[in-house]
């Protein structure tokens, strides 16, 4: 014979190793596994480990030329999910050597590239990843991080304020720039290109960049504050994306933007490197994330996409609001907000954090709260997100009955009132409405905003509960 036993394999003999002690250098994954009826959980967990590492469906001759023990993924623990029938969390350990250094792309191709179509599984969701320090250190991470951004902007002790310019499609570049100017002049720190504003026939990117730069410089001169507009550099090719970032740098503006999931991790990491080398901040939008993360039992949880972004690089990322029109459970959201901002995050299952994560001083990312929020939400947002965040009010600025600049004034007054109240020791959760009401006596712009949005609520049952 040829010296090996041919035939289809029983995965659990090789890949289910409950006695395995994880190494500090292993990448650890927590999968939510729903096996097909009749498939035992150990076999399903082992299949995940095999298919996302060294395994193939049958024994092959070339297995003899390598050391399976050194390179295989191992399913080292399986636990049933409370309250779910036939659903398990399978923990898998991957040896570090399976991954190319500094490549989020390769990490995802390996871990989630193939296994999600596997027939023995009804559904599969990647809930969390533990990135070991040895692998973290191969990534540059965010171009600048939270502290450097505050120093560049000279803004401390409060969240930053933003606004997405609407209508997102159809404005000419000059009118777009005018809307940017009014918002920044009224008191916002940032305005934002919508994620799907790239370079369309009604407004080419170069014209937009030029008029937005003009708006930034004019509003800076008039307010004495540093201003920015997230110029969306996302493009159809990496070369074109970098060309747009170069033009932004030539204009001297502080920040550009990228859609990291539609643009892809390879493009994103290149852009992040360019931004660090050239002193540009990088704002990240997560367009397409719900395609990947919305289903409770299949796909990838956003906390994994957030960790991946911190590795690939970005200074801001959208992270749900807890209070607005887009869903996001409070504890779960705060869990991945901490994963974005903090250096060391303890395992905490109540917040969806399956592993302790040590980022070994990789810079942090500012979470961006955006979507359906307005002045009445300000106390809750200040309380929930704290100072290190960007609060973005699109309609909540531009929908003001008196126009953009008064809308911006209303938001800035509301924010400053909340920060002052908090610093004076007041309870934002309990006295929030009172704080806003008091402030509106001194600000007609805020009073008008309070009138418009007094009854708006977006209330649905959350989808993604643990």
UniProtKB/Swiss-Prot annotation:
Mg(2+) binds at residues 192, 194-195. The modification N6-carboxylysine is found at residue 192. One of its GO terms (molecular function) is ribulose-bisphosphate carboxylase activity. The keyword Chloroplast applies. Binds 1 Mg(2+) ion per subunit. Signal peptide: none annotated. The modification N6,N6,N6-trimethyllysine is found at residue 5. One of its GO terms (cellular component) is chloroplast. Keywords: Calvin cycle, Carbon dioxide fixation, Chloroplast, Disulfide bond, Lyase, Magnesium, Metal-binding, Methylation, Monooxygenase, Oxidoreductase, Photorespiration, Photosynthesis, Plastid. It comes from the Eukaryota. It is found in: Plastid, Chloroplast. Its EC number is 4.1.1.39. Heterohexadecamer of 8 large chains and 8 small chains; disulfide-linked. The disulfide link is formed within the large subunit homodimers. The basic functional RuBisCO is composed of a large chain homodimer in a 'head-to-tail' conformation. In form I RuBisCO this homodimer is arranged in a barrel-like tetramer with the small subunits forming a tetrameric 'cap' on each end of the 'barrel'. PANTHER family: RIBULOSE BISPHOSPHATE CARBOXYLASE (PTHR42704), RIBULOSE BISPHOSPHATE CARBOXYLASE LARGE CHAIN (PTHR42704:SF15). RuBisCO catalyzes two reactions: the carboxylation of D-ribulose 1,5-bisphosphate, the primary event in carbon dioxide fixation, as well as the oxidative fragmentation of the pentose substrate in the photorespiration process. Both reactions occur simultaneously and in competition at the same active site. This is Ribulose bisphosphate carboxylase large chain. The lineage of its organism: Eukaryota, Viridiplantae, Streptophyta, Embryophyta, Tracheophyta.
